[in-house]
Amino acid sequence: DRIAVEIPGVTDASKILEELGNPGSLEFQLSDGTVFMTGDQVADAQAATTTDQYGNKQYVVQLTLTDEGAKTFGEVTSENVGKALPIVYDGEVISYPTVQEAITGGTAQISGQSTFEEAQTLATQIRIGSLSLQLSELESSVVGAQLGSQAISSSLKAAAIGLVIVMVFMIIVYAVPGVAAALALAIYTALVIATLYLFEITLTLPGIAGIILSIGMAVDANVIIFARIREEIASGKSVITAMKNGFHKAMSAILDGNITTLIAAIVLMGLGSGTVKGFAYTLMIGIILSMFTALVVTRWILYSFYWLGMRDEKFYGRAKERKTINFLQKRYVFFAISIAVIAAGFIGMGVHKASGQNSLNYGLDFMGGTSTTADFGKEYTIEDIENDIIPVVKEVTGDSNIQANKVEETTQITIKTRTLSKEERDDLNNKLADSFDVDESTITFQSISSTISGEMRADAVKAVIISTICMLIYIWFRFKDIRFGASAIIALIHDVLVVLTVYALMRISVGNTFIACMLTIIGYSVNDTIVIFDRIRENLALKHGKQTREDLMEVANRSLTQTLSRSINTSITTFIMVFMLFLLGVASIREFALPLMAGMICGAYSSICIATELWYVMKVHLGKNKITE
């Protein structure tokens, strides 16, 4: 019951519906103009890419007909082989296909489009023309060319700089394996770009954010492998044996961690809107390719270095014997710190609610309305905005509840109002240009209906709940003990609440990327936790006979200490990527990156200081086989 249309280069939102045409105005004609079929006999139309007999790429529209349409189309095409059957939409011929053969199966292929975008446009026109209803606007967004190009270029620059910094970091910390990781990372990035190109996935700003995040996460598998190799060398194994054992022992942690993150990406794909789905697609591609490059490409490069003569253990490093840190002794201090931070968030939300504001700074995606962002070319104080700009907006819109915010480190101002009609958006656009000499190419509009905003709120809650349940089931299945899963999930809830505190206290807009941010943090945090739990599982297997509380505490502390450097290094590399996005990205990307950075810090903290400690408490106090001694 909805159609999403993206039209590059169109800057007048008021004319888009008119340009799309009228529903129900699609006709299929014979060459003499006789109408033999109308749009109500069309079931679907989708753009696709195929290859001809010579291997050349073709852009086509796959047409699916109803049963009645299939019968009519079969009869007409049987009688008109070699003739053209024009497709007329809104009074104009939009395609002039020639019948190659009788089409009786209810599906047809319209070829001849020069680009995939052209095929998409034709498919959209056919779908809209086949509707027997009236179109109404649920959501529209117009982005000025200047803002769009700036956002894309700054995000790509952030990715490139972050990638180089991460490569240098890996080489400094891990020597020869670090060089292998850097080369694998370059191959990984090329594979991601090639995949996006081959599957013609539209690259949105959240999609770029997903790529940058996945680059940071791709390093994690290499860090786990290299840490294992160093441990094997320290235990007296030869370099070649250490490499074989290192990859083998790292396998379970890499698979478990990436699969749980993949669960979050799949939930996003199922419940997210268009922009969030773009993030989910790139994140999912990144996760799959990161596992491939770490387990296959890095292995191949590392073995190549070995057979080229780099066989001395000094090239690979040796794990140092570390004194076990007694993390669990401070468990109640950690719990108290977390409770205090989360309580501060709830108190902040209560204060906002008591002062007549929303507990969270809901954006249009969650509240509905129209957001207008324009570059005014000079700095305005809050008083100037209230005295000069808001009265002009009020005059045009008649809205008495107008919110205006400055975009940090720019001369842009965002104005939030009730939902504006196309005519009102036009009037506001002209008024801003006339009154403040605003360049119209910098003005962007985004409108969300109450229908869409209500669904987004529901989807946000649903996405978190579904992904959490799926992760709990997976961890329970893999670790054979629900206490592992329960402690991991409580740690995830802890991370969500802490990030919610950041949103509440810093008044960051809770919008479309909020869902992506939360699920990314969930996936990232559980990945970190699983690596530690995997080590606990391994160390527990070394303990034979009856286990005491002291045994459990010793295993937990030793596992945390053994994985500490990996947790720190992975957090640093991932943080670098997101920090570059925050540093160089446009305002909307920074609003996504800031809570994501907070979530990553919190995720590292919870996996080290909360999850394992909770597991220990549950192990000694809960369950049939709880340890009482």
Region spans (language model):
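A structural signal for conserved, well-ordered secondary-structure elements
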Residues: D1-E629
